């Protein structure tokens, strides 16, 4: 068997899992072997095996904001999970671990540290998560997507995204020849965002019919019926779907996106070259979505609209002020932020550390 063996540690949310999958693809394309350390009863347990990657799991959940009983049990739980992670590392003869964040990353990283196995971390958000902050002290390489997440020199690599998104034509080429109403894409993540589902139809109803953009709105799981009913009741036309399976085409055809500001969303917007009205999820850990959004706004690639300020009237005012020229400018500015080789950069850093 040729190639080295890498253990990717990521879980909890798609924002950790999908960038790690992109790196896994890059490592395997180079002839290396990948296993995955995740949590039991988790999103990664459902997703990762579909990609043909061996999944090992630890019985661990997050502690921030949880009950006193779980916090009191933390030392015992950590001891158990570190021991189990050590067993997994030895079993697979892992030569380097790569941490992307999530509950499982810390015990996996600590196990690697105790065994003398090199650690690489990749931070997807503008504010580093708890696991990665701790592991950064021991990591051989600290990589990050946003300039201020860490101060380690040479670590800015961006967030890994799918190649078919990065390979979209540049904004000027996509926008060429477009006329008529703006085409706006609304996405609140796979589960949707209730506040967007409620406010966007109301805002459009406040605009004159000839000033309303053409909407393509992802409702999120289980919310399509109520969203379509709201649009219909307000007399607003919109194309609503529960889940968009072809995001590449959705990005290609849109002039603008209304969305949350998760790390993966920001990475895809910049890779595609699309401006956005960003409504950060207000309860994200360390309010990292607001910091993510500011990264785009400071580059004049969109607007930040805090959820506390999101009203139908405010959104209607913003939408009424937009034109395709402004959307194109935002899209071009977004594209300048893209780091399209991120997955390969992370993979190559890990390969060097395992040497």
From Swiss-Prot:
It holds the Pfam family Glyco_transf_28. CDD domains: GT28_MurG (cd03785). Its EC number is 2.4.1.227. It is a peripheral membrane protein. SUPFAM superfamilies: UDP-Glycosyltransferase/glycogen phosphorylase (SSF53756). It catalyses: di-trans,octa-cis-undecaprenyl diphospho-N-acetyl-alpha-D-muramoyl-L-alanyl-D-glutamyl-meso-2,6-diaminopimeloyl-D-alanyl-D-alanine + UDP-N-acetyl-alpha-D-glucosamine = di-trans,octa-cis-undecaprenyl diphospho-[N-acetyl-alpha-D-glucosaminyl-(1->4)]-N-acetyl-alpha-D-muramoyl-L-alanyl-D-glutamyl-meso-2,6-diaminopimeloyl-D-alanyl-D-alanine + UDP + H(+). One of its GO terms (biological process) is carbohydrate metabolic process. It is an enzyme of class 2 (transferase). Its main location: membrane. GO terms for molecular function: UDP-N-acetyl-D-glucosamine:N-acetylmuramoyl-L-alanyl-D-glutamyl-meso-2,6-diaminopimelyl-D-alanyl-D-alanine-diphosphoundecaprenol 4-beta-N-acetylglucosaminlytransferase activity; undecaprenyldiphospho-muramoylpentapeptide beta-N-acetylglucosaminyltransferase activity. UDP-N-acetyl-alpha-D-glucosamine binds at residues 13-15, 125, 162, 190, 244, 289. Pathway: Cell wall biogenesis; peptidoglycan biosynthesis. One of its GO terms (cellular component) is plasma membrane. Belongs to the glycosyltransferase 28 family. MurG subfamily. NCBIfam families: murG. Cell wall formation. Catalyzes the transfer of a GlcNAc subunit on undecaprenyl-pyrophosphoryl-MurNAc-pentapeptide (lipid intermediate I) to form undecaprenyl-pyrophosphoryl-MurNAc-(pentapeptide)GlcNAc (lipid intermediate II). This is UDP-N-acetylglucosamine--N-acetylmuramyl-(pentapeptide) pyrophosphoryl-undecaprenol N-acetylglucosamine transferase. It comes from Neisseria meningitidis serogroup C (strain 053442).
């Amino acid at each position: 068997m040729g190639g080295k063996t890498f253990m990717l540690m990521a879980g909890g949310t798609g924002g950790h899992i999908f960038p790690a999958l992109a790196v896994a693809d890059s490592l395997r394309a180079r002839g290396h072997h990948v296993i995955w350390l995740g949590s039991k009863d988790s999103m990664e347990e459902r997703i990762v095996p579909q990609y043909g990657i061996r999944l090992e799991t630890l019985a661990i959940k997050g502690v921030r904001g949880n009950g006193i009983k779980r916090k009191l049990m933390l030392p015992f739980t950590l001891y158990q999970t570190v021991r189990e992670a050590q067993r997994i590392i030895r079993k697979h003869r892992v030569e380097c671990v790569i941490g992307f964040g999530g509950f499982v990353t810390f015990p996996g990283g600590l196990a690697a540290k105790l065994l003398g196995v090199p650690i690489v971390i990749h931070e997807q958000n503008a504010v580093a998560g708890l696991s990665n902050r701790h592991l950064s002290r021991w990591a051989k390489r600290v990589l990050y997507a946003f300039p201020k997440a860490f101060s380690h020199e040479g670590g800015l690599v961006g967030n890994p995204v799918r190649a078919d998104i990065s390979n979209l034509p540049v904004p000027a080429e996509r926008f060429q020849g477009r006329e008529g109403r703006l085409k706006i894409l609304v996405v609140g993540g796979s589960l949707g965002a209730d506040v967007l589902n409620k406010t966007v139809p109301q805002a459009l109803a406040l605009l004159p019919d000839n000033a309303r953009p053409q909407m393509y709105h992802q409702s999120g799981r289980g919310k399509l019926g109520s969203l379509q009913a709201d649009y219909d009741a307000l007399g607003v036309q919109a194309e609503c779907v529960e889940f968009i399976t072809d995001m590449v085409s959705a990005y290609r055809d849109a002039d603008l996106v209304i969305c949350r500001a998760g790390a993966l969303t920001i990475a895809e917007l910049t890779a595609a070259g699309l401006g956005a009205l960003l409504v950060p999820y207000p309860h994200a850990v360390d309010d990292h979505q607001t910091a993510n959004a500011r990264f785009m706004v400071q580059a004049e690639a969109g607007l930040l609209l805090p959820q506390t300020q999101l009203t139908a009237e405010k959104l209607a005012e913003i939408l009424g002020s937009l034109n395709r020229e402004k959307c194109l400018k935002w899209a071009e500015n977004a594209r300048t932020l893209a780091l399209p080789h991120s997955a390969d950069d992370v993979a190559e850093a890990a390969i060097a550390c395992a040497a």
